[in-house]
């Protein structure tokens, strides 16, 4: 009699994905972030579900309902802060995951990579809409500023913005629809993540060397299940340290002031995980140009496979490319810092230089370095 794990139609799918899956024997901890993202998503859906049970998506009561969750609901405060800081952990894992893909050439799995980029956009949209829900000052003005960017689209821009708002300004209709979208999108993300995995399992995992590992595979369970559990424990430890000791560390104090359309905060800025893109947006003096730069800063990831000029897949044996990759990381950290600074000298100039460097590194310098490395192989 065959094992139920291998014969049952549902169990068979799980078995082939998480138990008997042949995995490369040499994948490092950088390959942990996929499972960590799955855990983050489940955690966000669960905490979000419990928050939605007590949240009110009406402009008059939204802010009070969040205060009520924190003060009166049993363990509401921990659910709220796990959800808010869980988003930060989600983005840390996301950026690490994408960085790993860029470093080790995982973008050569075209379908997996493209679904991943779509996932990144979807998660960013979800996080943005979630930030609007507490209806604090930064929620309101963040929503106003970011949705207003669409008015830069020629001809249809203004109509599009008013259609999204459901009126002539960010108001009750906007908050209600943002809540609806914020609730449904994580389930769409979960479905997309399954497609992401489906495409990945068509080819099998990449590994640090970038060389085919077909000759040296080990079963996913117990080797990588135990490794993923360790990663999960560290993730939960980091999250709970944040939640229990400094829950407001990454938030904005302005969001503890109820939304007021008549009073603009001195510095409007998004959550920390969007600051790099916000810095790129602000560094272009033209509105439409800024919006295009903002979209392209993420959409550029789609071009990664086309910009791969090296004969080797991974950067493991390519010191020049490694150097440029870590310069890119430093550049992104600089952009993140600039995004949180006021629009004044010297921050404007630093932001513009960092923005130019960002696109220059990805579009010109890294492909050039790869070609130089190809020539060095002939020596």
From Swiss-Prot:
Record keywords, A-Z: Electron transport, Heme, Iron, Membrane, Metal-binding, Mitochondrion, Mitochondrion inner membrane, Respiratory chain, Transmembrane, Transmembrane helix, Transport, Ubiquinone
Any GO molecular function: metal ion binding
Signal sequence region: none
GO cellular component: mitochondrial inner membrane; respiratory chain complex III
Highest taxon above the source species: Eukaryota
SUPFAM superfamilies xref list: a domain/subunit of cytochrome bc1 complex (Ubiquinol-cytochrome c reductase) (SSF81648), Transmembrane di-heme cytochromes (SSF81342)
Transmembrane segments: 33-53, 77-98, 113-133, 178-198, 226-246, 288-308, 320-340, 347-367
Amino acids binding heme b b562: 83, 182
InterPro entries: Cyt_b/b6_C, Cyt_b/b6_C_sf, Cyt_b/b6_N, Cytb/b6-like_sf, Cytochrome_b, Cytochrome_b_C_euk/bac, Cytochrome_b_N_euk/bac, Di-haem_cyt_TM
Annotated binding of heme b b566, by residue: 97, 196
Chain residues that bind a ubiquinone: 201
Cofactor: binding comment: Binds 2 heme b groups non-covalently.
Annotated membrane topology: Multi-pass membrane protein
BP GO terms, sorted: mitochondrial electron transport, ubiquinol to cytochrome c
Cellular localization per UniProt: Mitochondrion inner membrane
Job description of the protein: Component of the ubiquinol-cytochrome c reductase complex (complex III or cytochrome b-c1 complex) that is part of the mitochondrial respiratory chain. The b-c1 complex mediates electron transfer from ubiquinol to cytochrome c. Contributes to the generation of a proton gradient across the mitochondrial membrane that is then used for ATP synthesis.
Additional detail: Heme 1 (or BL or b562) is low-potential and absorbs at about 562 nm, and heme 2 (or BH or b566) is high-potential and absorbs at about 566 nm.
Membership in a protein family: Belongs to the cytochrome b family.
Subunit description: The cytochrome bc1 complex contains 11 subunits: 3 respiratory subunits (MT-CYB, CYC1 and UQCRFS1), 2 core proteins (UQCRC1 and UQCRC2) and 6 low-molecular weight proteins (UQCRH/QCR6, UQCRB/QCR7, UQCRQ/QCR8, UQCR10/QCR9, UQCR11/QCR10 and a cleavage product of UQCRFS1). This cytochrome bc1 complex then forms a dimer.
Name of the protein: Cytochrome b
Species assigned in the record: Bubalus mindorensis (Tamaraw)
Biological classification of the source: Eukaryota, Metazoa, Chordata, Craniata, Vertebrata
């Amino acid at each position: 009699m065959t094992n139920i794990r291998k014969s049952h139609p549902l169990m068979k799918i799980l078995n082939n994905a998480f138990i008997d899956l042949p995995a490369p024997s040499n994948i490092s901890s950088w390959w942990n972030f996929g499972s960590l993202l799955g855990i983050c998503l489940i955690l966000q859906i669960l905490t979000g579900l419990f928050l939605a049970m007590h949240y009110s998506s009406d402009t008059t009561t939204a802010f009070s309902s969040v205060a009520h969750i924190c003060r009166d609901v049993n363990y509401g405060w921990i659910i709220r802060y796990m959800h808010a800081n869980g988003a930060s952990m989600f983005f840390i894992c996301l950026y690490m995951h994408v960085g790993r893909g860029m470093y080790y050439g995982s973008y050569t799995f075209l379908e997996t990579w493209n679904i991943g980029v779509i996932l990144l956009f979807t998660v960013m949209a979800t996080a943005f809409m979630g930030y609007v829900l507490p209806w604090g000052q930064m929620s309101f003005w963040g929503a106003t500023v970011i949705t207003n960017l669409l008015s830069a689209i020629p001809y249809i821009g203004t109509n599009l913005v008013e259609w999204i708002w459901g009126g002539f300004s960010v108001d009750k209709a906007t908050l209600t629809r943002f809540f609806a979208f914020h609730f449904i999108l994580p389930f769409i993300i979960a479905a997309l993540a399954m497609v992401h995995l489906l495409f990945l399992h068509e080819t099998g995992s990449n590994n640090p060397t970038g060389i085919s590992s077909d000759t040296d595979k080990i079963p996913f369970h117990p080797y990588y299940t135990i490794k993923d559990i360790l990663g999960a424990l560290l993730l939960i430890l980091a999250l709970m340290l944040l939640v229990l000791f400094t829950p407001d560390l990454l938030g904005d104090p302005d969001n503890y002031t109820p939304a007021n359309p008549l009073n603009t905060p001195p510095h409007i800025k998004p959550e920390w995980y969007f600051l790099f893109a916000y810095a790129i947006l602000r560094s272009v003096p033209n509105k439409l140009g800024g919006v295009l730069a903002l979209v392209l800063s993420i959409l550029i990831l789609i071009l990664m496979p086309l910009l791969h000029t090296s004969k080797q897949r991974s950067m493991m044996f390519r010191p020049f490319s490694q150097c440029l990759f870590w310069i890119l990381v430093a550049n992104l950290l600089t952009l993140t810092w600039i995004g949180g600074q006021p629009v004044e000298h010297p921050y404007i100039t630093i932001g513009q230089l960092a923005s130019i460097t960002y696109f220059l590194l990805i579009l010109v310098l890294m492909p050039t370095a790869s070609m130089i490395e190809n020539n060095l192989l002939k020596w």
